[in-house]
Amino acid sequence: MNTATCFIVLLVVATVIGGIEAGESDMRKDVMGLFRRVICTGADSPCAACCPCCPGTSCKAESNGVSYCRKDEP
């Protein structure tokens, strides 16, 4: 193989590897989003100091003194 052919092959391999890595980084973002959703406190659950309420909910105190994550009013 001559120099031009080697250069083209190297360019194609680099493009393929770059595409694979880009796909993996998107996958990592999805997995991290899933992980964040798992560790948040869902609606109608007691508020926890270690885990914030999930998006769309907020911590509200009840008459019994316990705070619960409740859905936000629109």
From Swiss-Prot:
PROSITE patterns: J_ACTX
An annotated GO cellular component: extracellular region
UniProt GO molecular function: potassium channel regulator activity; toxin activity
Site (described: Important for the neurotoxic activity): 39, 66
Keywords recorded for this protein, A-Z: Calcium-activated potassium channel impairing toxin, Cleavage on pair of basic residues, Disulfide bond, Ion channel impairing toxin, Knottin, Neurotoxin, Potassium channel impairing toxin, Secreted, Signal, Toxin
First-listed, main subcellular location of the protein, grouped into a coarse class: secreted
Signal peptide coordinates: 1-22
Site (Critical for the neurotoxic activity): 46, 50-51, 68
Pfam families: Toxin_16
Cleaved propeptide residues: 23-35
Family of the protein in this entry: Belongs to the neurotoxin 11 (kappa toxin) family.
Role noted for this protein: This excitatory toxin inhibits insect calcium-activated potassium (KCa) channels (Slo-type).
Domain notes: The presence of a 'disulfide through disulfide knot' structurally defines this protein as a knottin.
Protein name from the UniProt record: Lambda-hexatoxin-Hv1d
Source organism phylogeny: Eukaryota, Metazoa, Ecdysozoa, Arthropoda, Chelicerata
